[in-house]
Amino acid sequence: MEEWVRLQLLPEDNPQNWFSGVVTQQLYEKFLMLDKRNEGTLNAANLKLYKKGLPTVIDDGLPLDVSPLSTLFIDRYFETNVMMSGAEMDFRKFVDFVIAMETLPSCSRPHFFWKILDIEGTGVLTPMIVNSFFRETHAKLLSAGLDIPSRETIVQEVFDLIPTAQPLLVTREEFIQSSQAGLFTALIIDCLSFWTYENREQR
């Protein structure tokens, strides 16, 4: 993970142009890497092997068959994207997914992430819900031998990112309106984003 953090903390002289030929090729190669069945579509099992970066960073400090993204997040993505026939993702949907993941913690689509995070459909996020996503992220960080605080401490800190009317309770409106919605999401569903954030003072 240290190499991933080093890459993320490098100055970005050339912001990603998502419409360039080079990026299109990298996106297609990433898609083919995950399409183990050669079906031209991806299912949840395929996407649970997702590795970040364009071009894809395979050596991210995690086992080859472990994605930095929470499997619960991926399952919820498929559950909430009702436009996907037969719970399969085509290349167009894949590109949308990649852009959403690779631009975190920036977030131009808070509604997209809210639908995924609101497991109970109640319009509020509680520590129990956040911990459901973060549990796996925390385990991956520990497995990588990293020294990090307890889950309870981090969940508390994550809730502090978003101004709320009630402590430890984020409503849909508070999430959508917050400039920290992307960071809130990234820290609980992506172990690489979490570790990069923890090392942000090195920038």
What residue ranges belong to the model's regions?
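Long, highly charged low-complexity segments
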Residues: 16-26, 68-73, 101, 109, ...
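Amphipathic regulatory helices of Ca2+-sensor modules
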Residues: 1-8, 41-69, 88-102, 124-143, ...
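Primarily EF-hand calcium-binding motifs
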Residues: 23-39, 48-51, 61-65, 69-99, ...
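Solenoidal tandem-repeat scaffolds enriched in leucines and small polar residues
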Residues: 1-20, 24-28
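Detector for Asparagine
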Residues: 14-17, 38, 43-46, 81, ...
